Amino acid sequence: MANTWRLDIRGLDGSLVLIVLALITIGLVMVLSSSVAVSEVRFGHQWHYFQRQVFALGVGGLFAALVLMVPSQSWLQHRGKWFLLGLVLLALVLIFGREIGGAKRWLPLVVMNFQPAEWMKIATILFLAGYLQRHQDAVKQDSTAVIRLFLPFGIMAGLLLLQPDYGTTVLIAGVLVGMLFIAGAPFRYFVITVLPIGAILAVLLINSPYRMARVMNFMDPWQDPYGVGYQLSQALMAIGSGGITGSGLGASVQKLLYLPDAHTDFMFAVFAEETGWLGVVILLSLYGLLLWRMFAVAQAAWLPQAPFKALVVYGVAIMFAGQLLINVGVNLGVFPTKGLTLPFVSYGGSSLMMALLAIGLVLRIDYETRLIKGHSTEELSANPSFGS
């Protein structure tokens, strides 16, 4: 039953769907609010970024619907092909990609720009989950099983850093370490994994004046609030001015071309300004519920001899948690600017589409787990409230 291409939507996790819909709704409202000024200046009307986000939502919803129909066994069988596709796309973006803000990260398509790094996150999770299932005993006992991962992930990291995209590289490294930990790899293997990655990133950071300026900026943005510290200082002023209840939806001052990237990397600052700490608590609570539900799905899907499905869900949860932590940390001045979006909320077509695809994977795995545990499609049909 679990490998069927059929699906009864009444067997889906209703709470998980509602949480995602709530985040998407907040995202659409905030994309419209935070982008009106920059959209008016760049394109002559206020709706440009909102319309593109709605289009991405439609495409992402289609992706999620298609993924819901695909048995997880199919993703396991073709995990290597999906990872290879990601590497090819990362290579193509270096040749044919569109450069924005000094980084070449987007492939220009007919109707939109696509960021291959977003797909690479999903492909990495699928590939690593399959690898850890196939070599689960070796990973716990033999360090070479972990070292072998350096070749494919080293190639991927190299392609990402050439764009350059340090944020995605750090995020995927975190997903790699987290999934290894969940798979039962000994602590000493994390030293083998983390130290080389940290050393390489440190060398690249030191040799990049632009990146070093970002590090110095987040350490003390007020030292040069009109120079390298301008973006972060404006973000902090936005967050601080929101108070408890905020200035009201649409009433942000910083989004009026004072805060660069107000609709993308720094949307959290605009959200805090307009909704206050009350809104921030609600938003973070929704993310907390999302992660809690995904960890519950992963725990239920765990099979000692076949942990692929559980590891995929854990990987998606770690990915979302990492993006949330880094994005909020950047807005608060805890981390240097990384260029990672708030899942489902920040403007970004590729990010939204791939986030919905990832949720489709989680929902499919949860659906299969319910079937395996004795709830047939007929039982689900007889009890429409099941899974809500």
From Swiss-Prot:
EC number(s) stated in the UniProt entry for this protein: 2.4.99.28
InterPro entries linked to this entry: Cell_cycle_FtsW-rel_CS (IPR018365), FtsW (IPR013437), FtsW/RodA (IPR001182)
Pfam families: FTSW_RODA_SPOVE (PF01098)
Keyword line: Cell cycle, Cell division, Cell inner membrane, Cell membrane, Cell shape, Cell wall biogenesis/degradation, Glycosyltransferase, Membrane, Peptidoglycan synthesis, Transferase, Transmembrane, Transmembrane helix
Topology in membrane: Multi-pass membrane protein
GO biological process, one term: peptidoglycan biosynthetic process
Subcellular location: Cell inner membrane
UniProt keyword Transferase, yes or no: yes
UniProt GO molecular function: lipid-linked peptidoglycan transporter activity; peptidoglycan glycosyltransferase activity
Primary location recorded for the protein, binned into one broad class: membrane
Segment forming the signal sequence: none
Record-level GO cellular component terms: cell division site; plasma membrane
The keyword Aminoacyl-tRNA synthetase is assigned to this record: no
Domain of life: Bacteria
Catalytic activity: [GlcNAc-(1->4)-Mur2Ac(oyl-L-Ala-gamma-D-Glu-L-Lys-D-Ala-D-Ala)](n)-di-trans,octa-cis-undecaprenyl diphosphate + beta-D-GlcNAc-(1->4)-Mur2Ac(oyl-L-Ala-gamma-D-Glu-L-Lys-D-Ala-D-Ala)-di-trans,octa-cis-undecaprenyl diphosphate = [GlcNAc-(1->4)-Mur2Ac(oyl-L-Ala-gamma-D-Glu-L-Lys-D-Ala-D-Ala)](n+1)-di-trans,octa-cis-undecaprenyl diphosphate + di-trans,octa-cis-undecaprenyl diphosphate + H(+)
Xref: HAMAP family: PGT_FtsW_proteobact
Entry similarity comment: Belongs to the SEDS family. FtsW subfamily.
This protein's name: Probable peptidoglycan glycosyltransferase FtsW
Native source organism of the sequence: Thiomicrospira cyclica (strain DSM 14477 / JCM 11371 / ALM1) (Thioalkalimicrobium cyclicum)
